[in-house]
């Protein structure tokens, strides 16, 4: 009885080992086939002129929004379309809320995100890759056009700045010795500067350029721009590990920078070139 049991166990063990070896061989074969045909599914679609799926908000002008005709457009959207043209692929945008953007990448609802994502935290850097940046942002000082007191950041000491008390820009202005005039947001800050109740306001260059493009007669201009080392770049973001795809995106983006496409799109949506560090 015991011998039969041992023989049965031995037979079962041999069968399981054979099945396991078969499964391993199949997995190795599939992996080899995948590598031979071009790597990841996304890479194969790019190589074969397929479709890439891109997550974006569609409610965040001037980066991603719907124009008066209902067409999805914006700087990030048009840059992505230009990248797709360079790659020879179609692009399908999948609109989603900002809070669900990276979760959509995780669940493979889309291949990449085009929505002013800069990836600055260690947690995100460990999980996602970012292609070559197509926009750069950093702090700028906005003041009256005829105010010529802004030769350096250190020169802000003693000047009045309209800032939200809880903003990073308020903290930065305080570090340079400026006096904070509290406001609720950028719109109110600009009004105080125009009314001479504050000397300047500080904000992100992209937000300021968007305002100046909409209101060219505001009699305001950017006086100081954060150095390149303090600027952050936003680019197409995808799950970490697809190095070949990132390389192709970088190649396409570099070509768009070289042929002037990024500069042209920047000026169309912002009135200035935001595609390069300055």
Predicted regions: what they are:
Residues 19-29:
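Bacterial lipoprotein signal-peptidase II cleavage site
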Residues 20-22, 77-86, 167, 231-272:
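Extended ligand-binding regions for polar small-molecule ligands
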Residues 29-116:
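Extracytoplasmic small-molecule ligand-binding "clamshell" domains
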Residues 50-56, 153-166:
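Short loop->beta-strand "edge-of-pocket" segments that line small-molecule binding or catalytic clefts
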Residues 77, 93-103, 148, 166-167, ...:
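Short helix-initiation/N-cap motifs at beta->coil->alpha
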Residues 81, 90-155:
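Acidic, polar ligand-binding/catalytic clefts
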Residues 135-140, 205, 209-250, 272-278:
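Periplasmic-binding protein-like
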């Amino acid at each position: 009885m015991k011998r039969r049991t041992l023989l049965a166990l031995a037979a079962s063990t041999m069968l399981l080992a054979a099945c396991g070896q078969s499964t391993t061989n199949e997995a190795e074969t599939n992996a080899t086939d995948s590598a031979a045909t071009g790597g990841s599914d996304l890479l194969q679609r790019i190589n074969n002129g397929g479709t890439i799926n891109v997550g974006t908000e569609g409610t965040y002008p001037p980066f991603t929004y719907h124009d008066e005709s209902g067409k999805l457009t914006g700087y990030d959207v048009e840059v992505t379309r230009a990248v797709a043209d360079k790659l020879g692929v179609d692009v399908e945008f999948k609109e989603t809320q900002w809070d669900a953007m990276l979760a959509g990448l995780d669940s493979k609802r889309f291949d990449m995100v085009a929505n002013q994502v800069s990836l600055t935290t260690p947690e995100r850097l460990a999980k996602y890759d970012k292609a070559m940046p197509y926009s750069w942002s950093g702090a700028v000082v906005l003041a009256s056009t005829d105010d010529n007191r802004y030769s350096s950041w250190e020169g802000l000491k003693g000047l009045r700045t309209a800032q939200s008390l809880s903003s990073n820009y308020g903290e930065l202005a305080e570090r340079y010795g400026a006096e904070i005039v509290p406001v609720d947001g950028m719109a109110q800050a600009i009004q105080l500067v125009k009314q001479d109740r504050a000397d300047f306001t500080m904000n992100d260059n992209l937000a300021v350029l968007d305002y100046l493009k909409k209101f060219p007669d505001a009699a305001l201009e950017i006086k100081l721009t954060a150095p390149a080392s303090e600027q952050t770049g936003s680019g197409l973001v995808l799950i970490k590990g697809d190095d070949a795809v990132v390389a192709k995106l970088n190649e396409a983006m570099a070509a768009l920078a070289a042929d002037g496409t990024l500069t042209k799109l920047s000026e169309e949506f912002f009135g200035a070139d935001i595609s390069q560090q300055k």
